[in-house]
């Protein structure tokens, strides 16, 4: 359901808050490493719902309905997706939408990536595009959802407002997502949040949370003091005042609305799109979103309030008591970052507070220049460089031999589920008839040596055959690794040395700088598309560690992970959408030297412990090296 007002409608989380006893469309989604919820296909969602009806605490084998998802299993009890060949776990959620929305009609909107493949939009974006399409809007601005893209329906294209690059998009019909009727458990009600765990500690979330708490307290105080009186309907807002091209040189003040109806954030107009100007009846141009919808807030906050922004000089002082909110991209050619400006501005304006948006400091990505004579080896770490060449294909290891090496045969298995095929251990494997293997009988059951978890031998053979086939095995239940796990990282070079500068939070220590360099090349047999070219964007990549005992320990383990080809892999970039490119492989690095504005820098008190845990999950630890 969309918010009222003219022009492009933008939903909040796909829906508002419908009654609990109406029909809803169910969409299952998984959380990627950039904290974006990505929808499973309708076919997969139907499969998950069918399993859910039979056993709400069971597991879902996604490979049974989608051959590309063979390594993946969803644990319905913990609400996590587990990748069997790498051990990667990601939160999943069960989201709900109106049956008349895009997923209820089986409509999918997709954009074309650099490799010519079509990638589906996130579900909230898909619904937003479909709403605008049904209302016959000629264009749509996605800035309110945090994306700097314009959608043009006449040319069926998407344009990046900053780079002006265009991509094709398409609308196709697919299977409608499953429909459900009945009450929704509290853990799955609108709007479905992120995974239940530790709250996010990034600067933006801390700012929003503190702002929300402050505004709620002030608003409660105002409500206690203010007399109750009937609210008069707000007058239609006048058009925004003209601003000089390129935007104000300094800060931007957003004054509180005269009513509690809502607030809008106006910024300097940017260069308009190349498409024809919108006809009468389309919403007025918002300077923060060229040729697009006004930046929305939440619920009915889509209309601009009576307030206007006032540009002030960069040297003008901020009035006492007005909080300064750092905003990214607040410059002459870029918009106010909608995720930050919209959220905090609405919270403060709704509470009757003025808001001053200031320029955010730029991240310090690199240290000051360092001469060659100042670069020193890292104490206790031999050498300054490691190179990896093309994978030397070892003599092919028979999958049955690998599985039998780590398994002990169980003559009388318990009447429990095999968590790979979800059949009972006392019956034949679910891969009987799917995997042809004469040497392994489908009813054979084995127990892994260290952890003791039991599976059908045929199921483990199938799991191993779908992985990297490097002679190692990973328990799907506890993720214990048997053997030495290796990855699919392409050839490259890793350098490491000391530089005479300190990281924030480590004032008394020098810094370990790691430089990764991987050139463009051709994919090998272990990669997604053998024989096809892969790209390597952003290399050389510079990463930083403190030169203390724990930092050097992390470096030694990163060297081991590099030699086992676990640092990078070839896949699809979640930031650019480019396929067949080199991407990070679940081991986080700090690439911001002198600040932590992007979340990839220092200070970060928990980073070293977190990366040690990530390395352990990949089978790289000092204990495993000694074993």
Curated annotation (Swiss-Prot):
Residues 222-254, 269-327, 368-398 are annotated as: Disordered. It comes from Mus musculus. Pfam families: DTC, WWE. PANTHER family: DELTEX-RELATED. Belongs to the Deltex family. Regulator of Notch signaling, a signaling pathway involved in cell-cell communications that regulates a broad spectrum of cell-fate determinations. Mainly acts as a positive regulator of Notch, but it also acts as a negative regulator, depending on the developmental and cell context. Mediates the antineural activity of Notch, possibly by inhibiting the transcriptional activation mediated by MATCH1. Involved in neurogenesis, lymphogenesis and myogenesis, and may also be involved in MZB (Marginal zone B) cell differentiation. Ubiquitinated; undergoes 'Lys-29'-linked polyubiquitination catalyzed by ITCH. One of its GO terms (cellular component) is cytosol. Residues 296-314 have a biased composition (Polar residues). PROSITE patterns: WWE, ZF_RING_2. The lineage of its organism: Eukaryota, Metazoa, Chordata, Craniata, Vertebrata. Residues 230-248, 275-287 have a biased composition (Pro residues). Residues 386-396 have a biased composition (Basic residues). The gene is Dtx1. This is E3 ubiquitin-protein ligase DTX1. Its EC number is 2.3.2.27. Residues 14-94, 95-171 form the WWE domain. It catalyses: S-ubiquitinyl-[E2 ubiquitin-conjugating enzyme]-L-cysteine + [acceptor protein]-L-lysine = [E2 ubiquitin-conjugating enzyme]-L-cysteine + N(6)-ubiquitinyl-[acceptor protein]-L-lysine.
């Amino acid at each position: 359901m969309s918010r009222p007002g003219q022009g492009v409608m933008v939903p909040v989380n796909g829906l508002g808050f419908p009654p609990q006893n109406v029909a809803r469309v169910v969409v299952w989604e998984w959380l990627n490493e950039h904290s974006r919820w990505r929808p499973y296909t309708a076919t997969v969602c139907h499969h998950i719902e069918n399993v859910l009806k039979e056993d709400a605490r069971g597991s879902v084998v996604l490979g049974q309905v989608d051959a590309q998802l063979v390594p993946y299993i969803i644990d319905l009890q913990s609400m996590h997706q587990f990748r069997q060949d790498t051990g990667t776990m990601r939160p999943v959620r069960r989201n709900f939408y109106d049956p008349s929305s895009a997923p209820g009609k089986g409509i999918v909107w997709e954009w074309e990536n650099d490799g010519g493949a079509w990638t589906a939009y996130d579900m909230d974006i898909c619904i937003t595009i479909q709403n605008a399409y049904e209302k016959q809007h000629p264009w749509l601005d996605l800035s309110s959802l945090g994306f700097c893209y314009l959608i043009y329906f006449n040319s069926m294209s998407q344009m990046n407002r900053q780079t002006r690059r265009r991509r094709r998009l398409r609308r196709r019909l697919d299977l409608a997502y499953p429909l459900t009727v009945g009450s929704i458990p509290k853990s799955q009600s609108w709007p479905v949040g992120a995974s239940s765990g530790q709250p996010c500690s990034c600067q933006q979330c801390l700012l929003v949370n503190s702002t929300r708490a402050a505004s709620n307290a002030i608003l409660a105080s105002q409500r206690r003091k203010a007399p109750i009186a009937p609210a008069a309907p707000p007058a239609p807002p006048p058009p925004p005042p003209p601003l000089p091209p390129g935007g104000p040189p300094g800060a931007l003040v957003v004054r509180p609305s005269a009513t509690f109806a809502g607030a809008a954030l106006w910024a300097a107009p940017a260069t308009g799109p190349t498409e024809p100007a919108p006809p009468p009846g389309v919403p007025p141009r918002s300077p923060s979103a060229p040729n697009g919808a006004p930046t929305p807030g939440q619920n009915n906050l889509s209309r601009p309030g009576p307030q206007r922004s006032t540009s002030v000089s960069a040297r003008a002082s901020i009035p006492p008591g007005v909080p300064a909110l750092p905003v990214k991209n607040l410059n002459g050619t870029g918009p106010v970052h909608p995720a930050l400006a919209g959220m905090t501005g609405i919270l403060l304006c709704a509470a009757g507070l003025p808001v001053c948006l200031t320029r955010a400091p730029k991240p310090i990505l690199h240290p000051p220049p360092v001469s060659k004579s100042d670069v020193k080896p890292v104490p206790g770490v031999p050498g300054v460089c490691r190179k990896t060449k093309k994978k030397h294909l070892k003599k092919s290891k028979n999958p049955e031999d690998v599985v039998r090496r780590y398994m002990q045969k169980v003559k009388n298995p318990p009447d429990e589920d095999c968590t790979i095929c979800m059949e009972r251990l006392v019956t034949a494997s679910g891969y009987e008839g799917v995997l042809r293997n004469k040497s392994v009988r489908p009813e054979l059951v084995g127990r892994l040596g260290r952890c003791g978890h039991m599976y059908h031998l045929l199921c483990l053979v199938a799991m191993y055959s779908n992985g990297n086939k490097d002679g190692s095995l990973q328990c799907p239940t506890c993720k214990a690794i048997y053997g030495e796990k290796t990855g699919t990282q392409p050839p490259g070079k890793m350098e490491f040395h000391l530089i005479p500068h300190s990281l924030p939070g480590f004032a008394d220590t020098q810094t370990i700088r790691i430089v990764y360099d991987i050139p463009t090349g051709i994919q090998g047999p272990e990669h997604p598309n053998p024989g096809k070219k892969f790209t390597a964007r952003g290399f050389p990549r510079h990463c930083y560690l403190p030169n203390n005992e724990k930092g050097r320990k992390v470096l030694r383990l990163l060297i081991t992970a590099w030699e086992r080809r676990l640092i990078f892999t070839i896949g699809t970039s979640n930031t650019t959408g480019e396929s067949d490119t080199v991407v990070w492989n679940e081991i986080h690095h700090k690439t911001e030297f002198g600040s932590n504005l992007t979340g990839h820098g220092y200070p970060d008190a928990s980073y070293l412990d977190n990366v040690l845990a990530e390395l352990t999950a990949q089978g790289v630890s000092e204990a495993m090296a000694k074993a």
